[in-house]
Amino acid sequence: MNITIITCVLPWRLNSGGAQAQFNMIDRLRKKHHITIIFPEDSQNKMAYAKELQQKWPDVKLKPYRIWRQMLYPRFLKDKAERAFRLIFTPNDERFKVQRALKHYGIYPSYGFMQFVNKTIKEENTDIVQVEFYPCLWLVRKLPNNVRKVFIHHELRYKKNERTVMAYHPTEAELKWMNALKREELEDLDRYDTIVTLTEQDKEYLQQEGVKKPIMVSPAAINTEMTPFVPWNNRLAFVGSYMHHPNLEGIDWYINEVMPLLHDAPLLEITGKGWPDKYSGERVKLLGFVENLHDAISGSIMIVPILSGSGMRMKILEAAAMSMPIITTTVGVEGLKFIHGKSCIIADSPKDFAASIEKLAQDKEMCQMIGEEANKVFKENYSKDILAEVRDQVYAL
């Protein structure tokens, strides 16, 4: 089958959950299907990375929409300049934070880009067009009628908006805009032939909102190898990029509200790109992007203090694969098959989160029990081969 994937996140390098989710799935599917990937070149999707990926996947066609072509579109330059100005001069303004959260899609609807997309679809004799991530959702309006269209919804944007924006006391106008974006998201989803969510919970949310098209659940796979439990090394671990707002929000919550409640706070090591030096301190260490995640965090307690967003938390699966004990919020583990008190600990208040850290720090047997149970859940539900079979069923419809 010929599958053309349109994405705003190049599945290489593996420095974000979105990149990893795509890479591990495509790495399996390319052995059974002819895959073409269309992506916009930008500061994250560098041509150097595309060349590295092409060497790994000689059987996959990579089709970059070059940055110079995007710069010919006036709105592209206007938005980039305005955003840079606001980031420099008003980075902490609450209204700017709300505006960034309520950004209208993200891939610019230029005539040139759609020509490029539809020409590629025709040249590759495409059977299925697979669109990934919310910024690309609207493309369905411009795609040919004679191909099947599948959308992979990594994170329900309207659900993320609801959880994020309400913390900033939105104005009436902002609430009106948020609801308009929600309606547009749901309407565009119903333009696809099939919708894929990463969790059962996200599927239920969409069904409750009245989405009519078929919705299938196909969790994302990770590349972390399964390893046995390692005794606690007196450290906490967090994995995630600074550029993803729920990560930033969660770490701010932990540092400002949870850590002061700990009698002797363990060292927190943050793995992920982009974290500014201001987060580094006596009890917080920034590791940046690491090539070998296992070597960096094995033996730690994984914390997932996520307060907003939706979708699937890859960091929980990574911890479970390594038999690490996990402390998370309800939002952090939403849609995953981990159970409080058995394969993870769920704590939603600063007091409960701090108490959970201290409990595991003092109870080595509980640490091991939760880590091993988490690994069991991972093995039975989230291994790469199992998840690739599930995704292949989407194409067989």
Predicted segments, located by residue:
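Active-site proximal beta-strand in glycosyltransferases
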Residues: 3, 143-165
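Conserved nucleotide-sugar donor-binding subdomain of glycosyltransferases
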Residues: 78-128, 134-137, 170-191
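Donor nucleotide-sugar binding/catalytic pocket of nucleotide-sugar-dependent glycosyltransferases
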Residues: 150, 158, 175-178, 186-227
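Acidic donor-binding loop of glycosyltransferase active sites
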Residues: 193, 297-311, 322-325
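Conserved catalytic-core segment of nucleotide-activated headgroup transferases in glycan assembly
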Residues: 217-298
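Short hydrophobic beta-strand element within catalytic cores of glycosyltransferases
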Residues: 315-319, 325-329
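Conserved acidic donor-binding segment of nucleotide-sugar-dependent glycosyltransferases
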Residues: 344-351, 359-365
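A charged, aromatic-enriched C-terminal amphipathic alpha-helix characteristic of glycosyltransferases
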Residues: 365-395
